[in-house]
Design a protein with these regions (language model features):
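A residue-level structural signal marking coil residues immediately N-terminal to beta-strands
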Residues: 96-97, 127
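Catalytic Walker B motif of ABC-type/P-loop ATPase nucleotide-binding domains
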Residues: 99-103
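ABC ATPase nucleotide-binding domain helical subdomain, centered on the C-loop/LSGGQ "ABC signature"
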Residues: 8, 26-73, 117-118, 126, ...
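Hydrophobic anchor residue at the start of the ABC signature
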Residues: 88, 116, 132
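C-terminal portion of ABC ATPase nucleotide-binding domains
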Residues: 61-62, 118, 140-182
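ABC-fold ATPase nucleotide-binding domain signature/coupling loops
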Residues: 53-86, 95, 179-182
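Helical segment within the ABC ATPase nucleotide-binding domain
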Residues: 113-125, 137
Length: 182
């Protein structure tokens, strides 16, 4: 049996309902306080990779700005897309061997979404990344795709293989693609 803390440390997660804490930006990224000098550098690196460092550096106290207005009237409030980028920064900073993402780009525009997936796959190149999504254009980044139907694997393969099979995945992909071109 493994200690539960060791088990949990193996996973980084980004869920749709990601929550920010009423702490500083840096503490939100590292989920720890007080922060050492190295942890502050790690938070800054993660924010850079998540395309949020410029936004954070525009805040009055940069990474030391409190998030939310519960305890500070001048606390930072972030949009849905910015919150998702902060969630990605937290996952990058954790640097776990397995990353699980549930609709990590639902609040991002297509350009930001593409950049986010490039960042994720660059940062987690030698690790396992599992992501759940409905916007299939993002699935093209995956080494392996599993289409689930009624809790069962209905189709599996690479994007190219699934398109060639001309099954449900291909049908859904083409229907979504039509929305972008029409």
């Amino acid at each position: 049996e493994y200690p539960i803390a060791s088990y949990r440390n193996q996973f980084g997660t980004v869920f749709q309902d990601f929550q920010l804490f009423s702490e500083t930006v840096a503490e939100n990224i590292m989920v720890k306080r007080p922060l050492s000098g190295q942890q502050r550098k790690d938070a800054e690196t993660a924010l850079q990779k998540a395309d949020m460092l410029e936004r954070i550096n525009d805040l009055p106290n940069k990474m030391d700005t409190l998030v939310g207005r519960e305890f500070a009237p001048d606390g930072a409030v972030f949009s849905g897309g910015e919150t998702q980028k902060l969630a990605i920064a937290r996952a990058i900073a954790k640097d776990a061997p397995v990353l699980i993402l549930d609709e990590p780009s639902s609040a991002l525009d297509p350009i930001a979404e593409n950049k986010m997936f490039e960042t994720i796959f660059d940062s987690f190149r030698d690790k396992t990344v599992i992501y759940i999504l409905h916007r299939l254009s993002s699935a093209t980044f995956a080494d392996r795709i599993y289409l689930l139907e009624n809790g069962q694997i209905a189709e599996q393969g690479t994007h190219s293989e699934l398109i060639a099979q001309n099954g449900k995945y291909a049908d859904m992909f083409h229907k979504q693609a039509e929305k972008y071109i029409s």
